From Swiss-Prot:
Belongs to the thymidylate synthase ThyX family. This is Flavin-dependent thymidylate synthase. CDD domains: ThyX. It is an enzyme of class 2 (transferase). A motif (ThyX motif) lies at residues 78-88.
Length: 221
């Protein structure tokens, strides 16, 4: 399952371990029980999230492949209860891939046409110059780990993210929210879409009882 985000990014589900029933089994082991029936299992998930008993959801794990601008990745990796492995700019020559924001769509009502054109041109030109400098430094045999210092935060990076459902729900509360940067929001909404497809009962109860953001309430991600 791959969801395209922004102009060049994506959220791709590589693997997952468990689903709604994994949390039910983990919760019922406390009393030496297993799955009972669908309706009671669903109500148990609702009870767990309503009462804040979230440890059973740590047994559901997702592994994603993420491609996003570096400035988004740096916000993402502040969520430390997870595992990350990122594309290395020390060993890999970074592609000429930069996030180009759609200023007209985002700020067309607040900025005049002339300023929007100037801003878009300035961003594109700065990207081009920085990558030209990067390539020149590499051609001069400057190590890639040092040559990359001229590249902007808008450069695309890639990483693998493994996270349990409990931590993922915390991520969504903070990032699928209007207080988060818009670009970060778009990736969080894509993650929410994957989460909902794998764990629909958990997702529904999470939104109802534990979600602290404002972008997912009353909408389908």
């Amino acid at each position: 399952m791959t969801i395209e985000v922004l102009d060049r990014g994506f959220v791709k589900l590589l693997d997952h371990m468990g689903d709604d029933f994994s949390a039910v089994k983990a919760a019922r082991i406390s009393h030496g029980r297993d799955l009972i029936d669908e309706e009671r299992d669903r109500k148990l998930i609702e009870y767990l999230l309503r009462s804040g008993h979230e440890s059973p959801f740590e047994h559901i794990v997702f592994t994603f492949h993420i491609k996003c601008p570096i400035f988004v990745a740096r916000q993402w990796m502040r969520h430390r209860i997870a595992s990350y492995n990122e594309l290395s700019g020390r060993y890999t020559e970074l592609a000429e891939e930069f996030y180009l924001p759609d200023l007209y769509k985002r700020y067309g009502e607040r900025l005049n046409e002339n300023d929007l054109q100037k801003a878009s041109k300035l961003i594109e030109e700065s990207y081009k110059k920085s990558h030209e400098a990067y390539k020149c430094l590499i051609d001069m045999k400057i190590p890639k780990e040092l040559a990359r210092v001229v590249l902007p935060f808008a450069t695309y990076t890639q990483f693998i993210w493994s996270v349990n459902a409990r931590s993922l729900m915390n991520f969504l509360s903070l990032r699928a929210d209007s207080h988060s940067q818009w670009e970060m929001q778009q990736f969080a909404l894509a993650v929410a879409q994957v989460f909902k497809s794998i764990c629909p009962w958990t997702y529904e109860s999470f939104i109802r009882y534990r979600y602290e953001g404002d972008l997912l309430k009353g909408v389908n991600p």
